[in-house]
Regions:
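Conserved class I S-adenosyl-L-methionine
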Residues: 51, 55-104, 115-119, 135-139, 195-222, ...
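A short glycine-rich, Lys/Arg-flanked "PGG" loop and its adjoining helix->strand segment in the class I
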Residues: 180-195
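Conserved Class I S-adenosyl-L-methionine
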Residues: 113-115, 232-328
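Low-acidity, Ser/Thr- and Arg-rich intrinsically disordered low-complexity segments
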Residues: 5-12, 16, 21, 40-41, ...
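A short SAM/SAH-binding and catalytic strip from SAM-dependent methyltransferases
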Residues: 166-180, 202
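Class I SAM-dependent methyltransferase SAM/SAH-binding core
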Residues: 105-157, 166, 181
Length: 328
């Protein structure tokens, strides 16, 4: 549940990286971020050899985690009406990569409104779905009545070791303050030989991803101090090599990463509605401005949208994401 534009408006460099939510950051999708710095040596602990007790001792709620909770609080309805379709696009590829089929015990982490969970149920899988945001869980439960849906947040999940055959996380790693520790937790709950598949927004952002961020920047709005970026020591490059290397570091094997490119078809009204409602990082920035500044951002949004507008007035927004998968 991570929005790609969350990555498009910020200075370059690792200090600006946000990390996924579909719509999505993300997600985060949050989302990817500018720059191509390597994983910091501060992340050099051995994730494969960590015991559950050790993980518990190391788990902290970072400032980034706290800002993500603030950003997404109560936003499920607005997200469903604006950016959810975008984030649902890779779901079938995600489930294929995790080899989700009839009888697979699958965990959908950061389920959002339940797109991946619902698709997995449609394949006959035994689905458990979690999200950190209660309003998302309410919608996911309605959309996936056959799944076990509950509130839970990385990097500490309420499941036994080796409980699942497969784990999927659609635009989720963008929205956690400790990505490597989160992956270690996903590895813990996946059985030996089980599979994991994750998506994040890539960097640099595709043109459609950058639209809202460009409008904010053109209006002269700067990043709010109460929304900290992902810390340098927890950051990683939003590239095929960087994403795959992070899974390698977390102890997964047979890791592979591929790029997904598509044009998201939407309308100007739908796209703007998510921003002005405060959905995701970029939406939160927009909605927190004065009425005058919001109007100025909207003016630039309308001007910049022209290059993506089709003959019927609808928008075709290019997006790029990374799909990475591996085995325990």
């Amino acid at each position: 549940m991570i929005a790609p534009w969350e990555s498009s408006w910020k200075p370059s460099g690792a200090a600006s990286l946000l990390g996924l939510r579909p719509p999505v950051i993300l997600l985060l999708v949050t989302a990817g971020a500018e720059g191509d710095q390597g994983i910091s040596s501060a992340c050099a602990f051995n994730a494969t050899s960590m015991t559950r007790d050790m993980r518990g001792l190391m788990t902290t709620v970072t400032a980034f985690d706290e800002s993500e909770r603030l950003i997404w609080a109560g936003q499920a309805g607005a997200y469903a009406d604006s950016f959810a379709r975008l984030c649902a696009f890779p779901v079938e590829w995600l489930l294929d990569a995790a080899e989700v089929r009839l009888g697979t015990r699958v965990l959908d982490v950061g389920t959002g409104t339940g797109a991946a969970a619902a698709a997995a149920c449609g394949r006959g899988a035994e689905v458990t779905a979690v999200d950190a945001e209660p309003s998302m869980i309410e919608l996911a439960a309605l959309n996936t009545p056959m799944a076990d849906v509950q509130v839970a947040a990385l990097p500490s999940l309420p499941f036994k070791d080796d409980e699942f055959d497969a784990v999927v996380a659609n635009f989720v790693l963008n929205h956690v303050g400790q990505p490597l520790l989160a992956l270690a937790e996903l590895r813990r709950v996946t059985r030996p030989g089980g599979r994991i598949a994750l998506t994040i927004w890539s960097a640099p952002a595709a043109a459609g991803q950058a639209l809202l961020g460009r409008a904010i920047q053109a209006a002269g709005v700067t990043r709010p101090a109460h929304l900290p970026p992902l810390s340098l020591e927890n950051d990683f490059p939003r590239t095929k090599q960087g994403f795959a290397a992070l899974l390698d570091k977390a102890g997964f094997v047979e890791v592979s990463c591929q790029t997904l490119n598509w044009d998201h078809h939407t309308t100007s009204a739908e796209w703007w509605s998510g921003a002005v409602a405060g959905v995701g990082f970029t939406g939160h920035v927009v909605a927190s401005q004065s009425p005058e500044l919001i109007a100025e951002i909207k003016r630039h949004f309308d001007l910049l949208s022209a290059e993506f507008t089709g003959p019927d007035g609808s928008l075709w927004l290019p997006h790029t994401a990374l799909l990475t998968f591996g085995k325990v």
